Each structure stands twice: as C-alpha cells, then as structure tokens.
Amino acid sequence: MKIIKVTVVYALPKIQYICQVDIALGSTVKDAILESNLLNLTNDVSFHHNRIGIYNKTVHLKFKIKDGDRIEIYRNLTIDPKEWRRNNVFLSKKLKKIY
C-alpha cells in the first residue's frame, strides 16, 4: 500500500490550522480530514456546514486525493459580499468628505 502526503488547512482570522497527513493512496477528502484531527481541534469545522476544496476548487467529501494535495476547509461567510461592498463604499465616501 502506497502512502501519500497531503495537507489539511483551516484558517481563522487570528489562527491557522495546518496539518500534514500521511495517508493511503486512494483515500478520500473525508478520510484525510478525519486523519488530520481538525474536527477535534476546533468546534467551527463540520462536514455539514463547511465547504471543502482542493487548491481553491470545491470538491465532494468522496473525492479521491492525490499526493501533495492541499485540502482546504472554508469558513462560512459572516456578511453578504454585496452588503460588505455597500458598507465599504459608504465609509470611503464618508472619509472623503472629512478630508
């Protein structure tokens, strides 16, 4: 049985979890996440609430991983992107009036 190396990452605003995992060839994304123990390190990670990707491309939990893959666990958005842009434009206009 061949062993491959993958990285499982989860980033919060102030801390990043980066776990190197040695796992059997033919394993899935879910297997690698379970092997990384990230589910026990933080309460923010859940298979039901977080999207998963490899190199910024969303994949399913049953996706077969390859040697060198970086499995990324994405956080849920805290604010709608349109709302954030509206707030940002409003603040920048307000600052221009002050200066």
Curated annotation (Swiss-Prot):
**Which Pfam families did the record assign?**
Ub-RnfH
InterPro entries from the entry?
Answer: Mopterin_synth/thiamin_S_b, RnfH, RnfH_sf
**Signal peptide segment:** none
Q: Which Gene3D superfamilies match?
A: RnfH-like
User: What family does this belong to?
Assistant: Belongs to the UPF0125 (RnfH) family.
Q: Can you name this protein? A: Protein RnfH
Q: Which species is the source of this protein? A: Buchnera aphidicola subsp. Acyrthosiphon pisum (strain Tuc7)
**Record gene name:** rnfH
